[in-house]
Protein backbone atom coordinates (compact mmCIF):
# COMPACT_ATOMS: atom_id res chain seq x y z
CA UNK A 1 0.00 0.00 0.00
CA UNK A 2 1.35 3.41 -0.97
CA UNK A 3 1.74 5.90 1.87
CA UNK A 4 0.11 9.29 1.52
CA UNK A 5 2.42 12.13 0.68
CA UNK A 6 3.63 13.92 3.78
CA UNK A 7 4.70 17.54 3.68
CA UNK A 8 8.38 17.75 2.82
CA UNK A 9 10.45 19.19 5.63
CA UNK A 10 12.44 22.07 4.25
CA UNK A 11 16.06 22.17 5.33
CA UNK A 12 16.58 24.83 7.97
CA UNK A 13 19.18 24.37 10.64
CA UNK A 14 19.29 26.54 13.71
CA UNK A 15 22.65 27.30 15.27
CA UNK A 16 23.33 28.63 18.73
CA UNK A 17 26.08 30.86 20.03
CA UNK A 18 26.61 30.05 23.69
CA UNK A 19 28.91 33.07 24.07
CA UNK A 20 26.63 35.73 22.59
CA UNK A 21 24.78 36.57 25.79
CA UNK A 22 21.51 36.38 23.83
CA UNK A 23 18.92 33.99 25.31
CA UNK A 24 18.46 30.79 23.32
CA UNK A 25 14.78 31.41 22.51
CA UNK A 26 15.74 34.89 21.21
CA UNK A 27 18.47 33.40 18.99
CA UNK A 28 15.90 31.05 17.45
CA UNK A 29 13.53 33.95 16.77
CA UNK A 30 16.32 36.09 15.32
CA UNK A 31 17.37 33.31 12.96
CA UNK A 32 13.85 32.82 11.63
CA UNK A 33 13.42 36.58 11.18
CA UNK A 34 16.75 36.79 9.37
CA UNK A 35 15.82 33.80 7.21
CA UNK A 36 12.54 35.43 6.22
CA UNK A 37 14.17 38.81 5.57
CA UNK A 38 16.90 37.26 3.40
CA UNK A 39 14.51 35.01 1.49
CA UNK A 40 16.14 31.83 2.80
CA UNK A 41 12.81 31.03 4.46
CA UNK A 42 9.81 31.48 2.20
CA UNK A 43 6.12 31.46 3.01
CA UNK A 44 4.86 27.91 3.40
CA UNK A 45 8.22 26.35 4.23
CA UNK A 46 7.98 23.87 7.07
CA UNK A 47 10.23 24.27 10.09
CA UNK A 48 11.58 21.34 12.11
CA UNK A 49 9.40 20.13 14.96
CA UNK A 50 9.90 21.45 18.48
CA UNK A 51 11.22 18.05 19.51
CA UNK A 52 13.64 17.84 16.58
CA UNK A 53 15.10 21.31 17.24
CA UNK A 54 15.45 20.49 20.95
CA UNK A 55 17.27 17.22 20.18
CA UNK A 56 19.50 18.75 17.49
CA UNK A 57 20.56 21.65 19.71
CA UNK A 58 20.50 19.73 23.01
CA UNK A 59 18.15 22.25 24.60
CA UNK A 60 14.89 22.06 26.53
CA UNK A 61 11.82 21.59 24.28
CA UNK A 62 10.07 24.31 26.32
CA UNK A 63 12.64 26.81 25.03
CA UNK A 64 11.87 25.91 21.42
CA UNK A 65 8.15 25.93 22.15
CA UNK A 66 8.44 29.42 23.65
CA UNK A 67 10.24 30.72 20.56
CA UNK A 68 7.74 29.11 18.15
CA UNK A 69 4.81 30.44 20.19
CA UNK A 70 6.22 33.98 20.20
CA UNK A 71 6.84 33.83 16.45
CA UNK A 72 3.28 32.64 15.92
CA UNK A 73 1.95 35.57 17.97
CA UNK A 74 4.08 37.96 15.88
CA UNK A 75 2.69 36.48 12.69
CA UNK A 76 5.95 34.91 11.54
CA UNK A 77 4.77 31.30 11.80
CA UNK A 78 1.56 29.32 11.42
CA UNK A 79 1.13 26.07 13.32
CA UNK A 80 -1.27 23.50 11.90
CA UNK A 81 -2.25 20.84 14.41
CA UNK A 82 -0.99 17.45 13.28
CA UNK A 83 0.81 18.88 10.24
CA UNK A 84 3.59 21.11 11.50
CA UNK A 85 4.87 24.64 11.80
CA UNK A 86 5.22 26.74 8.67
CA UNK A 87 6.54 30.16 7.71
CA UNK A 88 3.50 32.46 7.60
CA UNK A 89 2.18 33.77 4.32
CA UNK A 90 2.30 37.41 5.35
CA UNK A 91 4.96 40.04 4.92
CA UNK A 92 6.47 40.97 8.27
CA UNK A 93 7.39 44.58 9.01
CA UNK A 94 9.89 45.19 11.78
CA UNK A 95 9.91 48.21 14.07
CA UNK A 96 12.80 50.67 13.88
CA UNK A 97 14.12 49.42 17.23
CA UNK A 98 13.95 45.79 16.07
CA UNK A 99 15.72 46.60 12.81
CA UNK A 100 18.48 48.48 14.68
CA UNK A 101 18.87 45.60 17.15
CA UNK A 102 19.14 43.09 14.31
CA UNK A 103 21.62 45.26 12.43
CA UNK A 104 23.76 45.61 15.55
CA UNK A 105 23.74 41.86 16.10
CA UNK A 106 24.56 41.07 12.45
CA UNK A 107 27.30 43.71 12.35
CA UNK A 108 28.86 42.45 15.57
CA UNK A 109 28.87 38.88 14.31
CA UNK A 110 30.30 39.95 10.93
CA UNK A 111 33.09 42.03 12.50
CA UNK A 112 33.97 39.19 14.90
CA UNK A 113 34.17 36.60 12.12
CA UNK A 114 36.14 38.91 9.84
CA UNK A 115 38.50 39.85 12.67
CA UNK A 116 39.10 36.18 13.41
CA UNK A 117 39.97 35.75 9.72
CA UNK A 118 42.54 38.54 9.99
CA UNK A 119 40.68 41.42 8.35
CA UNK A 120 40.91 44.93 9.77
CA UNK A 121 37.96 47.23 10.31
CA UNK A 122 39.34 49.50 7.58
CA UNK A 123 39.35 46.58 5.12
CA UNK A 124 35.77 45.69 6.06
CA UNK A 125 34.54 49.24 5.55
CA UNK A 126 36.24 49.39 2.13
CA UNK A 127 34.73 46.05 1.12
CA UNK A 128 31.25 47.19 2.17
CA UNK A 129 31.61 50.47 0.28
CA UNK A 130 32.75 48.56 -2.81
CA UNK A 131 29.54 46.52 -2.67
CA UNK A 132 27.34 49.61 -2.85
CA UNK A 133 26.27 50.48 -6.40
CA UNK A 134 26.99 54.03 -7.49
Indicate residue ranges for each PLM-predicted region.
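Residues at secondary-structure transition points
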Residues: 19-23, 27, 58, 62, ...
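Extreme N-terminal segment that seeds HTH/winged-HTH DNA-binding domains in transcriptional regulators
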Residues: 1-46, 101, 111-134
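Short, cationic-aromatic polyanion-contact patches
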Residues: 49, 83-100
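Beta-hairpin "wing" of winged helix-turn-helix
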Residues: 40-45, 72-82, 86-90
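A short alpha-helical element within helix-turn-helix/winged-helix DNA-binding domains
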Residues: 46-57, 71
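Residue cluster at the C-terminal edge of the helix-turn-helix DNA-binding motif
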Residues: 56, 73-76, 117
